[in-house]
Amino acid sequence: MRRYGEPPEKHRRYAFRAGVYAILPLNGSLLLTHQAEPTPEFQLPGGGIDPGEHPLTALHREVFEETGYRIAAPRRIGAFRRFTYMPEYDKWAEKICAIYVARPIRPHGPPREPGHTAIWTPADLAVDLLAETGSADLVARLLR
């Protein structure tokens, strides 16, 4: 599995964290999440899989929490790993990020996740906006 970002530090212990993220295209645009804290950045909607939770259940839950949208027809297109510090949890993690393409159905209200805003952006600009290089690379490959 391809790794993005910095290599793991030999002396550091990393908690395993599996996550699911969605590329949500509609009419030439992508639905992204802008997270205000701890560092403002654009992200693919998604996040961690809770213990015992099915990845697709987590994907639907995370997209809804971060964007307010329901989704349909998710299809896995790739995965990557990264070793990173997660300040919101105050821990170092080995993240396995599964990426799906899904169809956004319609909004059911604002994002429920504090500090998150759902943003529609032209698809060709999304690659440059995304803070995480693995996500940006998979979006770029999808758009080719």
Question: What residue spans do the PLM features occupy?
Answer:
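Local beta-strand/beta-hairpin segments that build beta-sheet-rich folds
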Residues: 1, 77-78
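A residue-level structural signature of the nucleotidyltransferase/glycosyltransferase Rossmann-like core
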Residues: 14-15, 22, 41, 118-119
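Acidic, metal-coordinating catalytic segment for phosphate/diphosphate chemistry
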Residues: 1-21
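Residues embedded in well-ordered beta-strands
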Residues: 21-23, 29-31, 98-101
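Conserved Nudix-box catalytic region and its N-terminal flanking loop in Nudix hydrolases
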Residues: 25-66
